[in-house]
Amino acid sequence: TLLVLSDDDEMKGYARRALDMTFDLFSLQCYHGMLLGSNGRAYPNDLLSPTTVQANVYCYFAWGTPYMPGTYRTPLLYALSPYECPPSTRKKALWDDDVPLVEKRVQGSEGVQTVFVKTKSWFFGSSSSPLEGKPGSQEHLLDIMVGDGKGRIWINHPGEADVFGSKRPGYFNGNGLTPHVSQFLSSCAVFYRFSSSDQSSAEVGYTHLICRRDAFDEQILEGKELFLRRGTVNLYIRAENGLEVPSSPFLSSFELRSPGLWNSWYVRLDDSLSFSEFVKAMRHCDVVGKRDCLLVRDPVYGLVRYASK
């Protein structure tokens, strides 16, 4: 509106700059037409049905991506305006390469660190939070997708016990207690480090992985470890406190719980090895959990230190 209707050239310049910055960020989040990655506020429907996120419509108008959910006034005004996003955003938004696009950003007055890594076959994004170590909010801090929307994966601490309750944060979205996420390329560690009093006051005493395991071609679940394959992409997920399948039939196929709120999760994605090679390599790599870090001797990256804060 300011870009089109303002009579002040300086204000128009600010408006264009704000739009350019927004669409540059969208281009990093865009994966097959879906806006992924860490978000300041996420709702259950955004996470469970990523093709219907309302903001996907901006990608549709800007780059011709496939999803145009029921829209509202702002995207309509954008579509009718003369504004065109920077040409440099198209390649990033429609990234179609096996070589990863890797970009890190520090944003806002709190210096929030965001990481985006994606190829044509997968997306891996994360964010820090000013609330780390404290009661949480609806922030979505880790987002992974392999293939299409059925291959979406994230880890969080439920903010309430009611699966489809009304609290914020909820069961699927945000964190009741906020972890620290440390990402290195296509790997990350998620640290939950909370005092006994914080743990006792939490409504839910476990963290969980949300993943539609039946959407993957192969899976191996053993104790602390989960191995997955979808196409040529492999995933290794490890929770220090173990992985448990919930008793509820409704949740058993797409949720794994890890008890306690002093816990470390580790996630590694790879598309360079066969599934059997990947399983063998990750079973033999050293994963050492310490109070202030997680040390992993990765078969490809070498020794990686993931700091817990």
Label each region the model flagged.
Residues 62-309:
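Ser/Thr/Asn(+Pro)-rich, low-complexity disordered segments
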Residues 1-105, 110:
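Extracellular polysaccharide-recognition and catalytic grooves
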